[in-house]
């Protein structure tokens, strides 16, 4: 059992204070190499609203994939999020349009991290993961 009570059961995951979420393996290509990333899929309004709230630890090559049925506009906030994150906003082809760093918010008034563009997907990972892997705007995510 992992420290943060994450138990892998096939392609499903149960986290403390979270419902069962489907996981998916994706890859991120930076022009020099392909980096695998396991993501927890948030594809309903309820799952997207919960996001990574109350998660105390996120393994290094894991994240959360937010899937929207159509292009969307607007930002993310970090209310009740305990760990700092980086987020990439993608178009419908998987092209990374914008990457932002986000810090936890302990108060009631939390800033919104807004890419100020339309996007189809968003991927949250540990703070600095994109930078450590030399992933930048214009790179692509492949949904395997």
Placement of each model-derived feature along the sequence:
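Helix-rich terminal scaffold detector
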Residues: 2-5
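Compact, glycine-rich, soluble single-domain proteins
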Residues: 8-144
